[in-house]
Swiss-Prot record:
Residues that coordinate or bind Mn(2+) 1: 47, 74, 176, 180
Binding-site residues, Mn(2+) 2: 73, 77, 152, 177
The family this protein is said to belong to: Belongs to the imidazoleglycerol-phosphate dehydratase family.
Name of the molecule in the record: Imidazoleglycerol-phosphate dehydratase
Activity regulation remarks: Competitive inhibition by 3-amino-1,2,4-triazole (e.g. ATZ).
Cofactor: record remark: Binds 2 manganese ions per subunit.
GO cellular component: cytoplasm
PROSITE patterns hit by this protein: IGP_DEHYDRATASE_1, IGP_DEHYDRATASE_2
Catalyzed chemical reaction(s): D-erythro-1-(imidazol-4-yl)glycerol 3-phosphate = 3-(imidazol-4-yl)-2-oxopropyl phosphate + H2O
Transmembrane domains' residue ranges: none
Localization in the cell: Cytoplasm
Species, as recorded: Mycobacterium tuberculosis (strain ATCC 25618 / H37Rv)
Annotated residues for binding of substrate: 21, 47-55, 73-77, 99, 121, 176-184, 205-207
Length: 210
């Protein structure tokens, strides 16, 4: 596996991640306006990442190819790893940001919540999904999305961005709604956490570093 990283500016990142299973390029601008272009070869995942970038107000470009003819797992997880790496790089030294964010997102019968701390200490808690999501496939294309991957996505994002991320489903029935509400909750929590805080000029930590 090879990974190359190039910082364009303090709030931007470009990540290239290549393995025998996938080839991924991500461009991220935290100070964007929600301009998103995603092509992973997994249509439902494209839909989820588009929602994430749009509702976080990030400018996000994702180009990924992988062994989806075997199964989408590798491409989905590797893309989440690269996205987390890009987020961590774009945050830089985290001076002047709010650091914490949280959001409740309803989607019809579903309610999801996400809370984030851009702490530099990677941790993910993912809870509340109904048991049937362990065995649900969202099809509609030749490359389906298995909802059991949701936890892997959030864990990979948190680990590689080095953030604490808590995602929970309070209630819901429809697998599409449950999945999408979680992605949107994470997006809105991140949007809040990365925002500049006009009252903070340094790193938002009593330790002086994150």
């Amino acid at each position: 596996m090879t990974t190359t990283q190039t910082a364009k500016a303090s709030r931007r990142a470009r990540i290239e991640r290549r393995t025998r299973e996938s080839d991924i390029v991500i461009e991220l601008d935290l100070d964007g306006t929600g301009q998103v272009a995603v092509d992973t070869g997994v249509p439902f995942y494209d839909h989820m990442l588009t929602a994430l970038g749009s509702h976080a107000s990030f400018d996000l470009t994702v180009r990924a190819t992988g062994d989806v003819e075997i199964e989408a797992h590798h491409t989905i997880e590797d893309t989440a790893i690269a996205l987390g790496t890009a987020l961590g790089q774009a945050l830089g030294d985290k001076r002047g940001i709010r650091r914490f964010g949280d959001a409740f997102i309803p989607m019809d019968e579903t309610l999801a919540h996400a809370a984030v701390d851009l702490s530099g200490r990677p941790y993910c808690v993912h809870t509340g999904e109904p048991d049937h999501l362990q065995h649900t496939t969202i099809a509609g294309s030749s490359v389906p999305y298995h909802t059991v991957i949701n936890r892997h996505v959030f864990e990979s994002l948190a680990a590689n961005a080095r953030i604490a991320l808590h995602v929970r489903v309070l209630y819901g029935r429809d697998p599409h709604h449950i999945t999408e509400a979680q992605y949107k909750a994470v997006a809105r929590a991140l949007r809040q956490a990365v925002e500049p805080d006009p009252r903070v000029s340094g790193v938002p930590s009593t330790k002086g570093a994150l």
